[in-house]
């Protein structure tokens, strides 16, 4: 059947535009010509769509909250290994769920899943090369020892030639990086770099050792480890990192920017935007639930992600986020810090329109949800007309 004829048949249905297009493409691809079959397909699709719609005035927020809260009580408090990568530890279970809904700026165990482009994804040596380019290398990684020379009152950095060769770093690179970060004189004796400060003292030298160890030489900052793992289903190599730095990783050759992601939702918002952050919230919560063997309809998670990102930035669900910013004074007071909210509202002369659920319950009024959203009254004209029809029927008989 032609596309235009199918469009005409679907024109007056309640199906959304994208669903109509998908249904048309399916019918055409399956080469269905029988009009009766097409009519039945459209009818069943419309019925299925109507069943998925939420009833008018349904409290979707409450349903979403209990649908996520109830499985949350069954979650474990422990931290598991990450999806078969024994070397990396990632927070899972209830602690991870709390991190997500609290919109923490930095997760307790930030990680990235780095996908590679086709040229690199199926070649192990190329994948390892990308991993080396990403992995952050500090002075500590290429030094055998870093200690204080008590005789000359200096810091001795004993370089490891093998580590430097593997990572393609020279002594000059190390000296240049140290000079950029610290104002001091450097003397080289073979594999030893002697760092001399202007006013040497034991206290001053001890204070500088941690800084020397953490000086960045190569790779992406904040990513101390990268592990290459082969995906058995796709046959491609995927990189798992400890630490997260999306914007810097995107600049490295061989990284697939479309699929690469992080578990740091606030970072995703800053780098990719609020829609990407919304998707990340859904995927992260869904991943936590699936790992625990808990099945929650994704639409509940979508409601939570929508409300967390509704005003263009990721906000937590709590007194410092959504609950603390409600328009209703009574709703804010009912959640936490009751006296503070009531004092503040009284001082500023705020009023409450009693438009939400909590505030109406507090004052003992019906809530504006479900049947509380509609008024019921008797249509007397209809009743009189009905009586008249019965009378007429009796006279005719």
From Swiss-Prot:
Pfam family, one: RNA_pol_Rpb1_5
One of the record's GO molecular function terms: DNA-directed RNA polymerase activity
Keyword Nucleotidyltransferase listed: yes
Family label: Belongs to the RNA polymerase beta' chain family.
Entry GO CC: cytoplasm; DNA-directed RNA polymerase complex
Alphabetically ordered keywords of this record: Cytoplasm, DNA-binding, DNA-directed RNA polymerase, Nucleotidyltransferase, Transcription, Transferase
Main location: cytoplasm
Enzyme Commission (EC) number: 2.7.7.6
GO biological process: DNA-templated transcription
HAMAP family, A to Z: RNApol_arch_Rpo1C (MF_00411)
Organism domain of life: Archaea
Protein name, entry field: DNA-directed RNA polymerase subunit Rpo1C
Compartment(s) of residence: Cytoplasm
Summary of subunit composition and partner proteins: Part of the RNA polymerase complex.
UniProt organism field: Methanococcus aeolicus (strain ATCC BAA-1280 / DSM 17508 / OCM 812 / Nankai-3)
Gene: rpo1C
Biological function: DNA-dependent RNA polymerase (RNAP) catalyzes the transcription of DNA into RNA using the four ribonucleoside triphosphates as substrates. Forms part of the jaw domain.
Reactions this protein catalyses: RNA(n) + a ribonucleoside 5'-triphosphate = RNA(n+1) + diphosphate
